[in-house]
A protein has these predicted regions:
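Radical SAM enzyme [4Fe-4S]-AdoMet core and its adjacent flexible, acidic
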Residues: 1-18, 23, 81-82, 121, ...
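Conserved alpha-helical substructure of the radical SAM core
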Residues: 3, 7-140, 145, 341, ...
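Short, P/G- and charge-enriched loop/turn segments at secondary-structure junctions
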Residues: 39-43, 267-271, 314
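Conserved residues at the C-terminal ends of beta-strands
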Residues: 70, 101, 152, 220, ...
Length: 366
């Protein structure tokens, strides 16, 4: 293991323009994460988190077709995690990155204090938002290398507005993105793909957001939430893999700022046979610590992070063992697997980072 870690570090430091971890994140953040990973591996820690998924509320100002997070009565939608509960979750978990999701986090009146507290702890914060409130609330935050606004855009204007079931949202989000970038904020795009999208459409979208000047783009097929309002919009796993192969073919030489590890992109293209690592992205919300992951909402909750790790029957979950997981390729489950693979096989990860995913030939077994 020590040999692999040394190789991993050498690959990272000797080739900063083709990073092992990803292309859409500053080197300082990558090195912080790499050091954290090395500490866990050298310490013999079996299960450790990479990203804390913090959901301080479920209330949202949109009702998206593919969302399974807002199907609750008002008494639940009106609940909030306090500043203290949010910071305690970060302390319990210890992950170097915190993704604040929801619901719409900017509806939380005390969110600026949550963000300040996380940054004071040295956490890299991704504040997820549909951007409808971003222009109004932007001055509540200060530009920082530790803060990124992660704006939800599921494609170009017509596609995104249809996805969120409201006209005009795309244009308002783009205006907010441009304003945030002009003020010096880090901005990321979070894009989910659904049925009916062509490779050409997605490539055009990625070209557009690159021109906007965003730092990175996270992209994945939509997870088939049981509570989503529409159930016919999700993509089967094999179709997702072929879609990504075709997208990546169109992206040759374009240097899209995809905010993913090289091996996760290779997985999306059907070249890696991965099982998910749900404890890599644990979720804390108003109910507690969600079992087993951010996406499955009916599996129960733990009172503490320690209880989540020790009492969750992890063997019950995965694409090969649980029908609910059958078509999942979400980065919240598989990015941690890809990063762990890169730690053990740094030369393979480096090769894929240099050459890109294989886009033809047989796919890995599912």
């Amino acid at each position: 293991m020590v040999k692999q870690l040394i190789q991993y570090r050498c690959c990272l430091e000797s080739n900063p323009t083709q990073e092992i971890l990803n292309m859409g994140v500053p080197l300082r953040q990558q090195i912080t994460v790499a050091k954290y990973l090395m500490k866990q591996k050298l310490g013999g820690v079996k299960r450790y988190p990479l990203v804390l998924m913090l959901e301080p509320l479920f209330r949202c100002n949109l009702a998206c077709a593919g969302c399974g997070k807002i199907d609750y009565p008002d008494e639940i939608l009106n609940r909030r995690l306090s500043v203290e509960e949010c910071l305690q979750a970060a302390d319990e978990c210890g992950a170097p990155i915190v993704s604040i999701a929801g619901g719409e986090p900017l509806l939380h009146r005390e969110l600026p204090q949550v963000v300040d507290g996380l940054i004071a702890r040295g956490k890299y914060v991704y504040l997820c938002t549909n951007a409808l409130l971003l222009k109004k609330r932007m001055d509540d935050y200060k530009p920082s290398p530790y803060l990124t606004f992660s704006v939800h855009l599921d494609g170009n204007r017509d596609r995104h507005d249809a996805s969120v079931c409201q006209d005009g949202v795309f244009d308002r989000a783009v205006e907010a993105i441009e304003q945030a970038i002009a003020k010096g904020f880090r901005v990321n795009i979070n894009c989910t793909l659904f049925q009916g999208e062509s490779p050409e459409e997605v490539a055009e979208f990625l070209d557009r957001v690159k021109k906007l000047g965003v730092e990175g783009v996270t992209i994945a097929p939509g997870f088939s939430y049981e509570h989503a309002p529409q159930q016919d919009i999700f993509i089967k796993m094999r179709d997702s893999k072929q879609l990504f192969r075709n997208i990546f073919k169109l992206g040759k030489g374009k240097k899209w700022p995809l905010n993913h590890s090289s091996l996760y992109l290779d997985f999306l293209a059907g070249n890696q046979n991965y099982q998910c690592t749900p404890w890599g992205n644990p979720t804390r919300n108003v109910f507690g610590w969600q079992k087993p992951c951010y996406l499955l909402v009916d599996e129960g909750y733990a009172k503490t992070f320690k209880e989540l790790l020790e009492d969750t029957p992890w063997e019950k979950y995965g694409t090969s063992t649980n029908p609910k997981c059958a078509n999942c390729m979400a980065h919240c489950g598989f990015e941690a697997t890809a990063v762990d693979d890169a730690m053990h096989n740094p030369l393979k990860a480096g090769w894929v980072a240099l050459r890109g995913p294989r886009l033809s030939g047989a796919m890995a077994s599912e």
